[in-house]
Amino acid sequence: MPDWLIAIVLGLVEGLTEFIPVSSTGHLLLTKIALGLTDPAWDTFIVLIQLGAVLGVVALYFQRLWAVVVGLPTQPEARRFALTVLIGCIPAFAAGLALHGVIKHFFENPYLPQVICVSLILGGVILLVVDKKAPPPREMDGMALSLKTAALIGLFQCLSLLPGVSRSGSTIVGSMLIGVDRKAAAEFSFFMAIPIMVGAFALDLLKSYKDIDASHAGAIAIGFVVSFLSGLVVVKFLIDFVGKRGFTPFAWWRIVVGVIGLGLIYIPR
């Protein structure tokens, strides 16, 4: 398969799965394995195109985010929102920096596909239960959460360092368990994704830039644009979808993909 087509496939997988609780990294790694991509440059490629999906969030929420930036000097609400995002990101930032080498090594484990599939299944079951049994929501606005709530969500986000867990899944499940409305949980997860993924982009580029060179520029550009456009579409429609149907469809998707993945691994062909 030519590199440009691989870039389109990976860009679509990234953009379509980054902001729904199904583990974009897990799907990307399973796709990479299925396509037989062994060049380390593709690992760095996967991290780099995540920034495209994040820019989809920035584009969609630009007016609200810009209002926060402009209002920081004079508006307490803007400063409070910025502080909640910062507090929510600190635990994952710290854990990611401290464990970057360990995480990279773990992702080279020969049993990584099995770990991802099991994580998808377990995460799907947990999401299914929480979506149906979560306590009644007390906080309804993703831009006006309490500092305590933001800190607790940040701790849940650390679970996303494990393969197949899902950053959005861990933050959404954590949010709902502590009384945040579904829509607000999804939106706050979007907002936290911006600094977290920009940080992951910068850290991985700093540590792995030697794995890529000018010959990869075209594929990276294609993957970046595709992930941006597909991420934009997903974010645009996700909030209304969640309000009407909840997260149950995504829970079942995780379970089905995990079971199929294990079947492909262990059933003789």
UniProtKB/Swiss-Prot annotation:
First and last residue of the signal peptide: none
Transmembrane segments: 42-62, 83-103, 110-130, 142-162, 186-206, 219-239, 247-267
Alphabetical GO biological process terms: cell wall organization; peptidoglycan biosynthetic process; regulation of cell shape; response to antibiotic
Location relative to the cell: Cell inner membrane
Positions of disulphide bridges: none
Keywords: Antibiotic resistance, Cell inner membrane, Cell membrane, Cell shape, Cell wall biogenesis/degradation, Hydrolase, Membrane, Peptidoglycan synthesis, Transmembrane, Transmembrane helix
Catalytic reaction annotation: di-trans,octa-cis-undecaprenyl diphosphate + H2O = di-trans,octa-cis-undecaprenyl phosphate + phosphate + H(+)
Topology within the bilayer: Multi-pass membrane protein
One Gene Ontology term of the molecular function aspect: undecaprenyl-diphosphatase activity
HAMAP family: Undec_diphosphatase
Other known facts: Bacitracin is thought to be involved in the inhibition of peptidoglycan synthesis by sequestering undecaprenyl diphosphate, thereby reducing the pool of lipid carrier available.
NCBIfam families xrefs: PRK00281.1-2, PRK00281.1-4, undec_PP_bacA
Biological role stated in the UniProt entry: Catalyzes the dephosphorylation of undecaprenyl diphosphate (UPP). Confers resistance to bacitracin.
Family: Belongs to the UppP family.
Designated name of the protein: Undecaprenyl-diphosphatase
Lineage: Bacteria, Pseudomonadati, Pseudomonadota, Alphaproteobacteria, Caulobacterales
Encoding gene (name): uppP
